From Swiss-Prot:
Coiled-coil portions: none
UniProt similarity note: Belongs to the PP2C family.
Keyword Hydrolase tagged: yes
Job description of the protein: Protein phosphatase that dephosphorylates EF-Tu.
Reaction equations catalysed: O-phospho-L-seryl-[protein] + H2O = L-seryl-[protein] + phosphate; O-phospho-L-threonyl-[protein] + H2O = L-threonyl-[protein] + phosphate
Name listed for the protein in its UniProt record: Serine/threonine phosphatase stp
GO molecular function: metal ion binding; protein serine/threonine phosphatase activity
Enzyme nomenclature, EC number: 3.1.3.16
Gene: stp
Chief location of this protein within or outside the cell: cytoplasm
Pfam families recorded: PP2C_2
Amino acid sequence: MHAEFRTDRGRIRHHNEDNGGVFENKDKQPIVIVADGMGGHRAGDVASEMAVRLLSDAWKETTALLTAEEIETWLQKTIQEVNKEIVLYAESEMDLNGMGTTLVAAIMAQSQVVIANVGDSRGYLLQNDVMRQLTEDHSLVHELLRTGEISKEDAMNHPRKNILLRALGVEGKVEVDTFVVPFQTSDTLLLCSDGLTNMVPEAEMEEILKSKRTLSEKADVFITKANSYGGEDNITVLLVERNLMQKGRDAS
């Protein structure tokens, strides 16, 4: 597997509340994670850092999970535990009250990838030169869009587009979505925070993914493009390709 991770403060924010990275378990099986924190007085930094650290630390203690079912079970269970830890920590620290974070994570399983998400950080897959969104935003605006109360154009500039219906660290239990999709050697997986998707039109995102650039160059272009559109939020991008020689390996 080849992965490229980038995070950038953007052009407006004074600090970066996004977090993420690539982490391996005892059998070198990778997990990729992106989290976007929220809350005043840098509480968002704490929430996203905790989510990534706790989930990756738990992953580092596992051995290879070979089936999608095993991975889904592990993600559901572990993300619940991470959520409880964040809630308890926020309750113990007065200035962290109200903090929370989104989370999107992915683990490879044979010729598939398992995605888990909470909030509005997204997962996309480029397959056969077509990009599609795998995750569903857990946000007020997405719910209004889903029920037909607003148009896609309205959603882009909606004044309440930052209101989440689900996040880690808010309540004692959180609903986690998981998806299992085919992931072949010619495919590219993109995990990102809304600092990318709120700035860069999806048609341009698809063109970047389809381009002949290297994976590293694509990651850089995503950050540059989001900043060129205004960089109004922190921007985090994680790109994943499966290496050709790893196609038949369980932990590739």
